[in-house]
Every structure is written in C-alpha cells, then in structure tokens.
UniProtKB/Swiss-Prot annotation:
Acetylation in keyword set: no
Organism domain of life: Bacteria
Species per Swiss-Prot/TrEMBL record: Nitrobacter hamburgensis (strain DSM 10229 / NCIMB 13809 / X14)
Cross-referenced Pfam families: Ribosomal_L9_C (PF03948), Ribosomal_L9_N (PF01281)
Protein name as catalogued: Large ribosomal subunit protein bL9
Length: 202
C-alpha cells in the first residue's frame, strides 16, 4: 500500500514522502495513529492544502519535545529483578517495565517511543533510545540488577559475574590448601612431615 507521510517516520521517510508499506503496518500503525494518508489522488490534494499547517505544528511539537528530551537524556533507570547466580533473569525486562520506571521518575512516554530490540534477560546495563518526537531522540541507561547495592557496583563498572567466579576460585584454593595443612600441628611436626615428604620424593 502507498501512503503519504504526515510526519517523519524513522527508517521510512520524511513528511510528504510517498512510500510503499505493508497493508498491516499501514492500517494498524500509520493510518491509525494519524501519521499518514492513503496515497490517493484526493489525499494528495488534501495534503498539499494542509502541508503548511503540518509544518508549523511540527516545529512547535519539536520544540516541546526538545525540552522533554533534556529531562530524559542521560537518565539511569534501575530495575530490580530476581536472577540466577549466572545473572540470567527469572523472566525479562520489557518496554512496559521501562515505561513504568520512567513514569515513577515523573516522565511520561508511550511504549512505541522506547526502542528495545528484544526483552532484557540478564543483569547488566543497556543504553536505549527514546523517540520523544520523530526528529528528537533521547538516551537512557537501563541498569538491571538483583539489588540496589549490585546496581551501584554495575554502574561503577564492576564485573559481577567475574567477582563471583574469583570468590569461588579463592574458596576452592583455600579448601585445597587445607587438605595439606593441619593448623593444630606443632612446628616440629610440620618440619618432620616436610622432611619425610622430601625423603620420599628422593
């Protein structure tokens, strides 16, 4: 289906462009949200008559969006979730969760404005784009952690999984050393034991 865009649409075109899209996308998104008109002869004439007004409205909306973007850009949103020892979430963080977290911060955006390729399924950080306006974008950092303390460590750049592995390795080393060392042994006993071992080795 060919449509006339009434505003800039990411990865599709600018205001006034005639583009070809799938019927479902046109009906369920572009036409439904007032972002486009069917590219009929009648609508082409209609667009020509409303072009000036659309451009004025777009400039106003863009200015307001820029103010909102200033409040959003650079925000660090923390979302606490349960996860396994390996950092795999028991569930996932979706656009709905991010929109809700922004709302708690006093920022209202709709789900289509948040660009998330796939649900977040592990702890860590991810930078996301929020399309405040077709021509204005802001960026937020989403930190997913098991606790507020862990979120702070992630923000500091600590590798949570590596820290846990290091602790496990250290514990194993201590346990292994304990098999060859008796803390209750007398110094002479230790020396004798060492001497016997050396003799056996020879």
């Amino acid at each position: 289906m060919e449509v006339i865009l009434l505003e800039r649409v990411a990865k599709l075109g600018q205001m006034g462009d005639v583009v070809k899209v799938k019927h479902g996308f046109a009906r369920n998104f572009l036409l439904k949200r007032g972002k486009a008109l069917r590219a009929t002869a009648e609508n082409r004439t209609k667009y020509d008559g409303m072009k000036a007004e659309l451009e004025i409205n777009n400039i106003k909306a863009k200015g307001e969006a820029a103010k909102v973007a200033e409040k959003i850009d650079g925000r660090d949103i923390v979302i606490i979730r349960q996860a396994s020892e390996t950092g795999q979430l028991f569930g996932s963080v979706t656009v709905r969760d991010i929109v809700a977290a922004l709302a708690e911060d006093g920022i209202t955006v709709s789900r289509p404005q948040v660009w998330l390729d796939a649900p977040i399924k592990t702890i860590g950080q991810q930078k996301l784009t929020v399309a405040v306006h077709p021509e204005v974008e802001a960026h937020v950092m989403v930190t997913v952690a098991r606790s507020a303390d862990e979120a702070e460590r992630i923000k500091r750049g600590e590798d949570i999984s590596t820290r846990r592995e290091d602790r496990d390795a250290a514990a194993e080393a201590i346990a292994a050393a304990g098999e060859f060392f008796d803390p209750e042994a007398e110094p002479d006993d230790v020396a004798e034991a060492g001497g016997e071992q050396t003799a056996e080795e020879k």
